[in-house]
Design a protein with these regions (language model features):
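Long, amphipathic alpha-helical surface segments
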Residues: 1-20, 26, 35, 52, ...
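Alpha-helical scaffolds flanking conserved acidic
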Residues: 4-8, 81-91, 119
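Generic secondary-structure boundary/loop-capping signal
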Residues: 19, 28-33, 76-79, 92
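Surface-exposed patches in mature extracellular/periplasmic domains of secreted proteins
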Residues: 19-22, 74-86, 123
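Substrate-binding/active-site groove segments that recognize
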Residues: 23-45
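Alpha-helical segment that forms one wall of the substrate-binding/catalytic cleft
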Residues: 44-76, 84-91, 95-102
């Protein structure tokens, strides 16, 4: 399975997949795999419940993942050199948080730079984000800790 296939699979679990426009927990129009409908996109003017094709969901996801990957490279300059599992975790967080909020995880990012996976996991756990999305963040924290365990073996 390619990196993008792995990422899509985990984001489908964390975000869900909706083939219609719906209102997210903030009342914002969303569709597909956690795609926020933006002004200028056709879905922005559609009512909740309007169907969205599988092809359109794939197109929007492709654009969102491209932005997510570029944002990860922007915030973490050595992103491409990180273990794949850490890249997946960072992309999942970036997809969920967006670049401005992800960039606020300064100690997490510093720990990633020095490959201190335990500190990175601690910083993930010690955040408002973790309290907001405990199931998702809990899985990602466990995975980050496992990267550290793999290094010790």
């Amino acid at each position: 399975m390619t990196f993008l296939e792995k990422l899509r699979k985990e984001l489908e679990v964390d975000e869900g997949v909706m083939y219609s426009v719906y209102l997210d927990h903030l009342g914002l129009k969303t569709c597909g795999i956690g795609h926020l409908c933006l002004e200028g996109e056709p879905e922005y003017d559609w009512p909740p419940g309007a169907p969205v094709t599988e092809e359109r969901v794939a197109e929007l996801f492709g654009k969102d993942i491209s932005i997510t990957m570029n944002d990860c490279r922007w915030v973490i300059d050595d992103f491409e050199q990180l273990p794949e599992e850490v890249q997946l975790i960072c992309c999942n967080m970036m997809f969920n948080l967006g670049r401005p909020r992800f960039s606020g995880f300064k100690k997490f990012i510093a720990a990633i730079h020095v490959q201190d996976w335990k500190t990175a996991a601690k910083e993930m756990a010690d955040s408002k984000w973790h309290r907001q999305v405990q199931n998702r963040s809990g899985r990602l924290i466990t995975r980050m800790l496992a990267v550290g365990e793999d290094d010790e073996s």
